[in-house]
Amino acid sequence: MTGLVFSRDTQDLIRRLSDHKVRYLVVGGMAVIYHGYARLTGDVDFFYEPTKANSIRLFRALLEFWDGSIPFINSPADLLEKGAIIQFGTRPNRIDFMNSITGVTFKEAWAGRIKETIQIRDGGYPLSIIGIVALEKNKRALGRHKDLDDLLYIKPSVSSSKKKIKS
């Protein structure tokens, strides 16, 4: 996979998400970069499926990542709170987890996702990225200046050649 660069911590987290079969999508600035607009971002945004089963998988992955004690998260139920946003670290290496995004449901975004493989020290791991249609819908619904600017520069042709996975 080309175009996205992740810190070692983020790579380790992606590996653990994969190992635990967490359903998530990379959204936000990193998705914008993937879709062709090279710009700065201070975090990596993960949009996870807000189901009980997936929150348990995510909780287990985070427990492993944090060596048994997740900051501010006591149980999988914390991950299911409506509109939950969990932030770890500081910019430029902050990691955000969210169970909803503006203008797009997880089901809708998952159906149009782009599936990539990220090479991490010990092998290749799947990485799901929000597809261009859902990303554009999300950015339009957010309506902030930076989101509207993103819409001017992302390139649909970048994702059209990538393999889209149907659920």
Identify the residue ranges that each predicted region occupies.
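Compositionally biased terminal segments of proteins
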Residues: 1-167
